Amino acid sequence: MPDADAGPAEYRCVLTGALLFHSDSPHELVEGGVAYAVRGSLDDGLEALAAGDGEQAAATAAAGFPTDVIDVIARARLQPLELDRPAFIQRWQAYLRALQAAVERDHGVERTERLALGAQIFAKKLLREFDELDFFTPPADSGDGPPPAAAPLAVLGYREDELTPYVYFLKEGVREVRGGANT
């Protein structure tokens, strides 16, 4: 049983240690346990930016950019990725190869095979809905240049109501860390 005094958990990438989401964001396993679906909400982006960087908030408002942000995306500082279908497939495959190597090392071949099958089925679903999705990744550690190809891929979609954002992460690519530690 988790230690209640440890505080909320963070869910981090098993490959990079990057923050993906917090335990206080409603989340559930979907697609037969292959992925986490993290429910988001729209927040006032200026407020969220001001909490982290007041100058950036002012510049965003002055430039006339949209000011609503999805809380899950903003809290994890996920960066948007512009992907067409071929780029998505290439990026997904690179991430999956790196993830499979880590899962095989830590959990064995059987779990890796389940990941491969589940991820393939999930990717086909994502491709069917491709035009309705947006893609994100955690910021690169150095902050310079594009994120590494094997960095986690977060997928943003909306439920049937077209108002409720959900961010999807492959379950095997996420580990729970209590107390906010990055280890």
Write out the residue ranges for each language-model feature.
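Non-catalytic accessory regions used for complex assembly or targeting
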Residues: 1-151, 157-183
